Each structure stands twice: as C-alpha cells, then as structure tokens.
Amino acid sequence: MIQVTGNLYVETGMTACNLGFVATKAGVVMIDTPMKPTDAVKWRAEAAGKGEIRYLINTEEHPDHWQTSHFFPGTLITSRETRDKLKEVPAARVLETVKHMDPEGVSFMEGYRVRLADITFADSMDLYLGDHTISLFRLPGHSAGGIGVYIPEERAVFTTDIVFQKKKSWLHESLPDQWLASLKKLSELDAEVVVPGHGELCKKDYLKEQAGIVEQWVEAVKSAIKKGWSIEEAEERIASPDPYPKQPGTPMTEPELNKAIVARLYQLYA
C-alpha cells in the first residue's frame, strides 16, 4: 500500500485492478475491490485501520473491480449500467473463478452473493464526507458502466480502465469515440495524481499516450476494412499497435486478446 497524499492510499499489487481509499475525518471511502477473497480480507483490514468504512465505489462492471465487494461494509455506489450488468451475474460463476485463481479463498465464499449497488447515478454525483468531496462521473469507452472518482482536496483522480499505464489496453468491449472523450474529460481536471485502472500511478501527460493507443488500434482496423480483409483475415494479420505487455494474471493470452480487440473494432467500423 502506498500513501499517495495526506489522506489517499493506493494498492497496485493485488489482482487485478488498482485499489484505493480516502481516509476522511468522517470515515473511509473505498474505490474498487480485489478479485481474490484472500486479498479482500487483507485490504479490508488495511482500510478499516484508517477509520470506519462508510462507502465503497465500484468503477465498472468487469469482475476485477467488484468481485469481492461482498466482503466489504459500507454503502455501495456504482453507475446504473454496472448495477444492471451485475444483476445478470450468478454467484456460482464467481465461485468457479475463485476456485481457479484463489483456492485458499474458497473457504471465505460461504453465503457469497454478487453485491448490487445501494446507490446509482446516471451522469455524475458528489459525495461529501468530513472535509472531502468525492466527485463521481461517467467515464465510458472501455466499458459501458465506467466511472471516474475525483478527490479535489487530494488533487487525485481514479480513472477506472480508461487508463492502462504501460499495460496492454483492453479494447475488447470498447467504444473508442467515448473512450477518447473520457480521456479529454480527465485532462481537464486539476489533478496532480492519476490512478489508472491498471499500471503504476502517473501524471496527466500519460493521457495523450493512452489516446494514441486507442487511435492506432482504430486506424489499424479501419485500414484492414478498407483493404477488403475479412474479419478472420484482420484477426490473423493485424499486429498490435500497443507497445505494452498484457498484465500478468489476467484472462486470455495476448494473441487471444488481440483477436478480441480486432473483432470488436471490426464489428464497429465495417
């Protein structure tokens, strides 16, 4: 765990997304949860050591952001889209995932349920706790339900998976125009610290590089379509323009992810 600012703590070493919390005078606000129950128990203890856990925020609908929310106290906040998506996820599917990736965590799974948000919002909302403002706002593009979390008093923003800092970007469900618009929104914030969905903490200057990766993927697929390649040909022939490796411990092989990205973009632009 890293103490990033006076009241902001971040964990970048658990599977799979980055985690954080703000320790306010009136309690703790947590951002995202680990995938492994064994990690969740440790992370819960870290946060509870700084105060009562009052709120938990899941920044999108992919399981690396919400899978262990069941193990955390506090009022849960997500976007409407994320809550709607999670209503469709059976607890049995999560149990099978845990058996595979965290065998020691199976003992924690008795009574497990996929936790749904207590509060949702459509576009943005502000939470006031102690001396802190927690501003939540929609950040679609990587996923339908993505949201950002901005803490102006700490000059920090959690970007969900709109930013992969020097990790391979997952565009397998992307809407690139929305992704680029979300990056522009992030660039306009007064933030000194950028907490990406994956990778190490960075500054706002990385947003330009992230936008370039999205744009290069789109250009590569549009070029293949213009040449008359079939989707199968595009999947086989397009080399990834992303210079960074896939994060270890995440699903799919790198070739499988490349094909999934090409297929998604081909369907959008063909």
Predicted features, each with a name:
Residues 1-45, 148-160:
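Conserved beta-strand hairpin/beta-sheet module of binuclear metal-dependent hydrolase folds
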Residues 7, 22, 32, 47, ...:
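Divalent metal-coordination and catalytic microenvironments
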Residues 18-20, 119, 123-125, 147:
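Residue-level detector of beta-strand structural context in well-folded domains
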Residues 28, 35-36, 87-217:
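Metallo-beta-lactamase
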Residues 37-82, 190:
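Active-site metal-binding motif and surrounding structural segment of the metallo-beta-lactamase
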Residues 42-44, 68-71, 89-91, 171, ...:
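Short amphipathic alpha-helical segments
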Residues 188-190, 201-270:
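Accessory terminal helices/loops
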